[in-house]
Swiss-Prot record:
<dbReference type="Pfam" id="PF00047">
    <property type="entry name" value="ig"/>
</dbReference>
<keyword id="KW-0325">Glycoprotein</keyword>
<dbReference type="InterPro" id="IPR036179">
    <property type="entry name" value="Ig-like_dom_sf"/>
</dbReference>
<feature type="disulfide bond">
    <location>
        <begin position="121"/>
        <end position="180"/>
    </location>
</feature>
<comment type="function">
    <text>Constant region of immunoglobulin heavy chains. Immunoglobulins, also known as antibodies, are membrane-bound or secreted glycoproteins produced by B lymphocytes. In the recognition phase of humoral immunity, the membrane-bound immunoglobulins serve as receptors which, upon binding of a specific antigen, trigger the clonal expansion and differentiation of B lymphocytes into immunoglobulins-secreting plasma cells. Secreted immunoglobulins mediate the effector phase of humoral immunity, which results in the elimination of bound antigens.</text>
</comment>
<feature type="glycosylation site" description="N-linked (GlcNAc...) asparagine">
    <location>
        <position position="166"/>
    </location>
</feature>
<keyword id="KW-0393">Immunoglobulin domain</keyword>
<feature type="domain" description="Ig-like 2">
    <location>
        <begin position="99"/>
        <end position="184"/>
    </location>
</feature>
<feature type="disulfide bond">
    <location>
        <begin position="23"/>
        <end position="75"/>
    </location>
</feature>
<feature type="glycosylation site" description="N-linked (GlcNAc...) asparagine">
    <location>
        <position position="43"/>
    </location>
</feature>
<feature type="glycosylation site" description="N-linked (GlcNAc...) asparagine">
    <location>
        <position position="72"/>
    </location>
</feature>
<dbReference type="InterPro" id="IPR050380">
    <property type="entry name" value="Immune_Resp_Modulators"/>
</dbReference>
<keyword id="KW-1003">Cell membrane</keyword>
<dbReference type="InterPro" id="IPR013783">
    <property type="entry name" value="Ig-like_fold"/>
</dbReference>
<keyword id="KW-0472">Membrane</keyword>
<feature type="glycosylation site" description="N-linked (GlcNAc...) asparagine">
    <location>
        <position position="84"/>
    </location>
</feature>
<dbReference type="InterPro" id="IPR013151">
    <property type="entry name" value="Immunoglobulin_dom"/>
</dbReference>
Amino acid sequence: SIRNPQLYPLKPCKGTASMTLGCLVKDYFPNPVTVTWYSDSLNMSTVNFPALGSELKVTTSQVTSWGKSAKNFTCHVTHPPSFNESRTILVRPVNITEPTLELLHSSCDPNAFHSTIQLYCFIYGHILNDVSVSWLMDDREITDTLAQTVLIKEEGKLASTCSKLNITEQQWMSESTFTCKVTSQGVDYLAHTRRCPDHEPRGVITYLIPPSPLDLYQNGAPKLTCLVVDLESEKNVNVTWNQEKKTSVSASQWYTKHHNNATTSITSILPVVAKDWIEGYGYQCIVDHPDFPKPIVRSITKTPGQRSAPEVYVFPPPEEESEDKRTLTCLIQNFFPEDISVQWLGDGKLISNSQHSTTTPLKSNGSNQGFFIFSRLEVAKTLWTQRKQFTCQVIHEALQKPRKLEKTISTSLGNTSLRPS
């Protein structure tokens, strides 16, 4: 009967200028097996040995490599009728020069209007002209913000390099882990950092919320919201605002809310000029109290990075839905930044927010750095069967003016139609 092989990658314990690797293929029947080596190295030679054994077979394949950089070698084995597996071996030269990494960041308590944190990755003692740097956030490569990488020193055949990356305060305060990934001589080196321990009053949390695209581009009344939660009371709490163009600005609205868990929250709303926000001017919300060791400062500006317009898809109700309601779903994906507004219309008229709900933006998987959301609308079965038209309206800054995109669905249309508004 057919028996598939077992694979064992073989590697010497000690590195030399040239290195011989092996791939042991054993306990298979019948002959033959095919062994193929793959590598990014041009300096390699291979030898395949004949199979041994009267019943279960065993064979070996060898590859010899030489060079100054680390490389991956993959042994790929096939055995009829369907066996198809690989094993990969990393080869590091004996005389590899390992650089030293140092990852630094700017203040953990940034009070500047442009709420960015600077990450600096210093790479000391690498081979000249043999270094590449990439940045990761929670193990995912950052592609929407460009890093600045410069050579800072040459010492014979060695050099030192610095890479600088700007991230938003929101990214930093999310407690994500940021990684500087350096590749030199084919080997990866990593340095990690994350935000400093909390320096603010325990329990009191402050959020600074940007203008919604709906208010910014359609209603013409953009506003910033500063939300302070988990206060004992509003007594002696002082909330002030600063704007980059002015020393201070006055909020137009202030709300206090008492909660069942005996805490108090404060909401301060600041109207902003749309042109100032779009041009990137910064704002600060400062929360102070006599018992605080220091004021809580939150800064915000328009999110930096390459813009990406959303893709919009509307799905009809599922056929299995049997009650008097019908559920329409709108998928909005691959947009950046994450600020987005979604509304639903019925025959061109705005539908109440109580009839639909929208998820918070979620990060897309894979290499795409965009976001996606779902919006769900419930309508009466009679309205759907009467061939009413329902529209998912999306407002986002990366769309063409007037920054709106609509997708309409109806039983009378037969399918959906997409149009900019």
